């Protein structure tokens, strides 16, 4: 089954569209299969990809870490999803008590239904993580229609740190998941013009790097096994409460739930998955999808930005083709 499911990714590696790829599939009963091919790095020294390599998970941080943290704190009664972020961050836009940012709720940010912009080059405003956090909190953000926004999750990350009194990196995320630098071999990402080097074991996202390497929107690293372990916890119910599972599956805005995307026409998970499927992707070439009806999850991890993001790797179509192949192979096998 796994060989059939991995065929699109194997072809992408063989054709030179991406340096390396790993596919992991897990069922609710814990059965797992993994395949990988290609290179963890092309530069500065060639390095073959192995099952033990840690990937920069990019925006999978939003669901594996930040969303899970927020929902756990809600379970514990330490925050209310429908209360404003100012419950945790009283100094958010503190010099304008009428500011719209002060009315944003945790659920608003989780579901990307705010007016905040998709992204802002926060890293260009300085190199002190504490001052950059203050900048994010005090900035009068330009308003626009709801979009998928890193700023939403930077704010959520700050809120989690305020509530717990500890950095995000202190949160126990599970085996083979954590903020960088990872403890094992790392997959290379981009030749970063800002930092003047090829990144390997340090976060690719510029804003996350400037915020100290750990932020609500990016910064998490993990192996295939680590991502599958998280996904299995969602499938078997051991990794999230019933309330948290309901929150990540129920629509909040358009095709979004608390943190995740729901299946919609043209999404990166493919068309074959059930309507009860949620997923998320990461800029570095990562992705995770969970089909609750089938009791199935799969993760496709690539280093498609290595050595540069400025090339057409066909990652969107590869993700869709992989989703179709995974579901097709699963349905034939079970």
What is each stretch, according to the model?
Residues 19-21, 284-287:
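Short loop/turn microsegments at loop-to-beta-strand junctions
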Residues 85-93:
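Acidic helix-start/capping segments at beta-turn-to-alpha-helix junctions
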Residues 34, 84, 96-276:
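Short, surface-exposed loop or secondary-structure junction motifs
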Residues 2-57, 78, 309:
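Short, conserved catalytic-motif segment at the N-terminal edge
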Residues 55-58, 146-148:
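Catalytic tyrosine of NAD(P)H-dependent dehydrogenase/reductases that use a Tyr as the general acid/base
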Residues 33-35, 288, 295-304, 308:
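Short, well-ordered beta-strand elements
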Residues 236, 243-244, 249-254, 265-267, ...:
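Short, gly/Ser/Thr-rich active-site loops of penicillin-recognizing serine hydrolases
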């Amino acid at each position: 089954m796994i060989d059939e499911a991995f065929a699109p990714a194997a072809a992408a590696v063989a054709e030179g569209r991406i340096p390396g790829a790993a596919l992991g599939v897990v069922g609710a009963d814990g059965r797992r299969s993994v395949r990988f091919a290609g290179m963890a790095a092309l530069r500065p020294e060639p390095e073959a990809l192995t099952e033990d390599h840690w990937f920069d998970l990019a925006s999978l941080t939003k669901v594996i870490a930040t969303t899970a943290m927020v929902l756990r704190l809600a379970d514990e009664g330490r925050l209310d999803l429908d209360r404003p972020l100012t419950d945790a961050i009283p100094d958010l836009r503190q010099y304008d008590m009428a500011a719209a940012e002060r009315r944003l709720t945790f659920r608003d940010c989780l579901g990307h239904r705010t007016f905040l912009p998709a992204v802002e080059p926060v890293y260009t405003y300085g190199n002190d993580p504490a001052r950059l956090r203050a900048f994010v909190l005090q900035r009068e953000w330009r308003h626009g229609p709801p979009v998928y926004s890193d700023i939403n999750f930077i704010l959520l990350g700050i809120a989690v740190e305020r509530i717990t009194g500890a950095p995000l990196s202190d949160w126990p995320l599970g085996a083979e998941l954590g903020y960088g630098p990872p403890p094992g071999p790392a997959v290379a990402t981009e030749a970063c013009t800002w930092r003047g080097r090829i990144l390997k074991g340090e976060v690719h996202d510029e804003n996350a790097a400037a915020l100290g390497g750990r932020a609500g929107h990016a910064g998490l690293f993990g192996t295939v096994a680590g991502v599958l372990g998280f996904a299995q916890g969602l499938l078997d119910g051991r990794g999230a409460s019933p309330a948290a599972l309901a929150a990540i599956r129920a629509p909040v805005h358009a095709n979004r739930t608390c943190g995740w995307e729901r299946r919609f026409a043209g999404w990166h998970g493919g068309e074959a998955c059930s309507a009860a499927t949620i997923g998320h992707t990461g800029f570095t070439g990562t992705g995770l999808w969970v089909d609750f009806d089938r009791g199935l999850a799969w993760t496709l991890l690539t280093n498609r930005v290595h050595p540069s993001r400025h090339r057409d790797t066909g990652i969107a179509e590869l993700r869709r083709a992989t989703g179709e192949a995974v579901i097709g192979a699963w349905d034939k096998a079970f």
